[in-house]
Regions:
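ATP-dependent adenylation/nucleotidyltransferase module used to activate substrates
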Residues: 1-157
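Catalytic subdomain that performs nucleotidyl-dependent activation
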Residues: 82, 119-132, 146-217
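Short alpha-helical "packing" element that flanks the helix-turn-helix/winged-helix DNA-binding module
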Residues: 220-226
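Generic structural signal for individual residues within well-ordered alpha-helical segments
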Residues: 14-15, 183, 222
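Generic signature of intrinsically disordered, low-complexity segments enriched in small/polar residues
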Residues: 23, 140-142, 163, 167, ...
């Protein structure tokens, strides 16, 4: 039997997280928050919590897309930025990741080392996550903001993130909330249903799916982790 996780009180959770974010920003003597909006539920909730904590004028949303980013995700990132009414920019990371491939001469290297395609795919996917982290910190430095992480408890517990990529941040406000609990909170906090219900994916390569990679649905995973 799959265990259903207890529902979190959305009002109490919001107050607690808002206090945590405000204290962290104030301790850092920072002026605001940069959030990478991917168009998914985790970053949408993180953006919402940032705005609730600091006001929309102190939050910058950035969507960093590549050729493998699903069009729907770009649409949802824009939708979220509009709903939150925050400053928002879109940056393509394709040129930067292509430059990396040229510099590392990946094609010749593969013939030398016999690296299989899957390994290359994962290395390139992780590279994209790390490029995104670098861009978030670049904008954070320019504005004296901190970078908000978007990792949930389910992913953090099993290590389903890129070290120094999406794992590179100053604060993880949803890091204590399991994915299935987050879906219910997102509903209460007014995150659009389209964003909540679409299959979770990182868009690091074509047709990527979180649950395929993990090998379990988040319902099963959370029931095991909890």
């Amino acid at each position: 039997v799959m265990l259903k996780l207890p529902k979190i009180n959305s009002k109490e959770a919001k107050n607690e997280i808002v206090n945590f974010i405000q204290k962290t920003v104030s301790d850092a003597n920072a002026k605001g928050i940069v959030v990478g909006l991917s168009g998914g539920i985790d970053s949408s909730v993180s953006g919402f919590l940032a705005v609730e904590s600091l006001g929309k004028e102190n939050v910058l949303g950035i969507h960093m897309y590549s050729s493998t980013t699903p069009e729907e995700d770009r649409k949802h990132a824009r939708l979220m930025a509009n709903l939150l009414d925050i400053k928002y920019i879109e940056v393509s990371i394709d040129t930067i990741s292509e430059e990396f491939s040229l510099v590392t001469d990946i094609k010749n290297m593969t013939t030398l080392e016999n690296t299989d395609q899957d390994t290359i795919k994962i290395a390139n996917g992780n590279l994209k996550a790390r490029i995104r982290m670098s861009l978030l910190y670049y904008y954070a430095n320019l504005k004296n903001y901190i970078v908000i992480g978007t990792g949930n408890r389910s992913e953090l517990l099993i290590g389903y993130f890129t070290k120094y990529g999406d794992g590179g941040c100053d604060i993880e406000p949803i890091g204590d909330i399991y994915k299935t609990q987050l879906r219910l909170l997102a509903k209460d906090w007014g995150i659009p249903e389209d964003i909540i219900s679409k299959p979770p994916r990182a868009g690091l390569w074509p047709n990527q799916s979180d649950e395929d990679e993990i090998g379990l649905s988040y319902e099963k995973l959370d029931s095991l982790l909890y």
